[in-house]
């Protein structure tokens, strides 16, 4: 849930700082900042967003607008930040969502999910 952090850049720096040499950082996330939580036209009728109500979806949008990471192009932003904090290789999987969301059910996530993996050198 990196996208919910008020200072993701600092978080990445701290994660890499405390990770021991040879340790693995895995991040599974999506570019939620680009999505409008209240846009439900492509969601199945049993999707969770229909159960939370418009007030909560609007609050989500207000909170998201305050988070700097919401204005970033992800995962490119994440990779750039990690490049500043590690000498290790960084692997990105931008097809993750296609493999884990095989059907549009109540858990379906329309934001394209990605994973990032790096090993601290």
For each feature predicted by the language model, list its residue ranges.
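A short SAM/SAH-binding and catalytic strip from SAM-dependent methyltransferases
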Residues: 1-8
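A short glycine-rich, Lys/Arg-flanked "PGG" loop and its adjoining helix->strand segment in the class I
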Residues: 9-21
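C-terminal alpha-helical "lid/dimerization" subdomain adjacent to the S-adenosyl-L-methionine
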Residues: 28-103
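Short hydrophobic/aromatic beta-strand or adjacent loop that forms the aromatic wall/cage
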Residues: 110-117
């Amino acid at each position: 849930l990196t996208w919910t952090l008020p200072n993701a850049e600092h978080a990445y720096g701290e994660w890499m700082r405390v990770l021991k040499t040879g340790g693995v950082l895995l991040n599974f996330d999506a570019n939620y900042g680009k999505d409008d939580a209240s846009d439900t036209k492509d969601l199945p009728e049993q999707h969770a967003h229909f159960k939370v109500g418009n007030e909560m979806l609007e609050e989500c949008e207000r909170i998201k607008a305050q988070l700097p990471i919401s204005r970033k192009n992800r995962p490119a932003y994440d990779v750039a930040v990690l490049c500043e904090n590690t000498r290790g290789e960084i692997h990105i999987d931008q097809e993750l969502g296609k493999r884990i969301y095989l059907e549009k059910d109540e858990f379906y996530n329309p934001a394209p999910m990605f994973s990032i993996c790096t090993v601290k050198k």
